[in-house]
UniProtKB/Swiss-Prot annotation:
GO BP: any one term: cytoplasmic translation
Organism: Drosophila melanogaster (Fruit fly)
The name this protein goes by in its record: Large ribosomal subunit protein eL32
Family that this chain belongs to: Belongs to the eukaryotic ribosomal protein eL32 family.
UniProt superkingdom: Eukaryota
Cellular-component GO terms for this entry: cytoplasm; cytosolic large ribosomal subunit; cytosolic ribosome; nucleolus
UniProt KW keywords: Ribonucleoprotein, Ribosomal protein
Gene Ontology molecular functions: structural constituent of ribosome
Transmembrane segments: none
Presence of the UniProt keyword Ribosomal protein in the record: yes
Secretion signal, residue range per the UniProt entry: none
A Pfam family per the record: Ribosomal_L32e
Length: 134
């Protein structure tokens, strides 16, 4: 039985396109990642019509759906079994994600304990070898 979220609203993003850096299309040495323009004559900073848009607080997501996964859960990073038990009372709101540096031996323990506690994991199959490969 899979665990379902307690509350699953429609997640609406105000803007899905990335904000790109001014003149990053013109020069290869400038990456596309956003950097705030600081020049005194910069037309992006002065918000001229037809220029790139600058990120601001108005593009923020709805507070209830911020950091929410498409499944309706919020992510919680888990490094060991003890951290997983924090999610026991919040298993309808948060799902666990096993951290990158956790060994495959500990991963098996975390996955087993998550099933017992009925806590959902985003990456339960990560780095788990089957019996035939061992």
């Amino acid at each position: 039985m899979t665990i379902r979220p307690a509350y699953r609203p429609k997640i609406v993003k105000k803007r899905t396109k990335h904000f790109i850096r001014h003149q990053s299309d013109r020069y290869a040495k400038l990456s596309h990642k956003w950097r705030k323009p600081k020049g005194i004559d910069n037309r992006v900073r002065r918000r001229f019509k037809g220029q790139y848009l600058m990120p601001n607080i108005g593009y923020g997501s709805n507070k209830r759906t911020r950091h929410m996964l498409p499944t309706g859960f919020k992510k919680f990073l888990v490094h060991n079994v003890r951290e997983l038990e924090v999610l026991l009372m919040q298993n309808r709101v948060y799902c666990g994600e096993i951290a990158h540096g956790v060994s495959s031996k500990k991963r098996k323990e975390i996955v087993e304990r998550a099933k017992q506690l009925s806590v959902r994991l985003t990456n339960p199959n990560g780095r788990l070898r089957s019996q035939e490969n061992e």
